[in-house]
Amino acid sequence: MGRGRVQLKRIENKINRQVTFSKRRAGLLKKAHEISVLCDAEVALVVFSHKGKLFEYSTDSCMEKILERYERYSYAERQLIAPESDVNTNWSMEYNRLKAKIELLERNQRHYLGEDLQAMSPKELQNLEQQLDTALKHIRTRKNQLMYESINELQKKEKAIQEQNSMLFKQIKEREKIFRAQQEQWDQQNQGPNMPPPLPPQQHQIQHPYMLFHQPFPFFNMGGLYQEDDPMAMRRNDLELTFEPVYNCNLGCFAA
């Protein structure tokens, strides 16, 4: 009885998967070498493991030449095929490509919002969770950076305001000091020891020359009394001082 067809599917056991990869890789490299020797063909083989490790094989170790040749051929083939292609077909392919991209973006957006999660496998959910955690870390980092910059800006403004207040306070103190010095100098000038006190405003008026000769002043009368404040006595004394000497003089003349 022959052996049945083995169903191709992913090997879940990690160790078995690694062993199978090593065996199949060795067989694949052997087949590439055989075809290059038997058929005189230029062969280039590139294999990446699930961990990202590179395995390659090329005829006569000329991988770069084979890749350059492949690139030139692909570019030339595209240039030849492009003019012959139908324009409508290109637009249809572009439309389908963009439509598929839009559907993928919409599905990812729903997943990010926590919607349509029933059809996702545990591995897909784990990947989605990791993406959301990474996005949250970026968001928190950016938010903290903005808050830190805002705090620094506010601290700079506060420092500038404090410096301005200190400068204004010093200016006010200096002006008060100057004002006090000027006030003390003014008081010393107005209240000096050799300067009489200022007169009231009405006494600073200029008097008429006639009034200078009619100011009351003290004098003696013939009776020997000192008169100063009585106006009637002043008039009487004026008369006595004026006429009595004349009368005495006349009497003396007659007696002689």
UniProtKB/Swiss-Prot annotation:
PANTHER family given for it?
SERUM RESPONSE FACTOR HOMOLOG
What name goes with this protein? Floral homeotic protein APETALA 1
Please give the subunit comment from the record. Homodimer capable of binding to CArG-box sequences.
Q: Where is the MADS-box domain?
A: 1-61
Q: Name one GO molecular function term.
A: RNA polymerase II transcription regulatory region sequence-specific DNA binding
**Lineage, opening ranks:** Eukaryota, Viridiplantae, Streptophyta, Embryophyta, Tracheophyta
Disulfide pairs here are none
UniProt entry keywords in alphabetical sequence:
Activator, Coiled coil, Developmental protein, Differentiation, DNA-binding, Flowering, Nucleus, Transcription, Transcription regulation
Keyword Transcription regulation tagged: yes
Task: Kindly name one Pfam family recorded for this protein.
Answer: K-box
Its biological purpose is as follows: Transcription factor that promotes early floral meristem identity in synergy with LEAFY. Displays a redundant function with CAULIFLOWER in the up-regulation of LEAFY. Required subsequently for the transition of an inflorescence meristem into a floral meristem, and for the normal development of sepals and petals in flowers. Regulates positively B class homeotic proteins.
This protein's record includes keyword Heme: no
Q: Which InterPro entries match?
A: MADS-box/MEF2_TF, MEF2-like_N, TF_Kbox, TF_MADSbox, TF_MADSbox_sf
Q: Where in the cell is it found?
A: Nucleus
| Domain K-box as annotated: residue spans | 88-178
Gene Ontology BP term (one): cell differentiation
Q: Which SUPFAM superfamilies match?
A: SRF-like
Query: What GO cellular component is one of the record's annotations?
Result: nucleus
Q: Which gene encodes it?
A: AP1
Transmembrane region positions? none
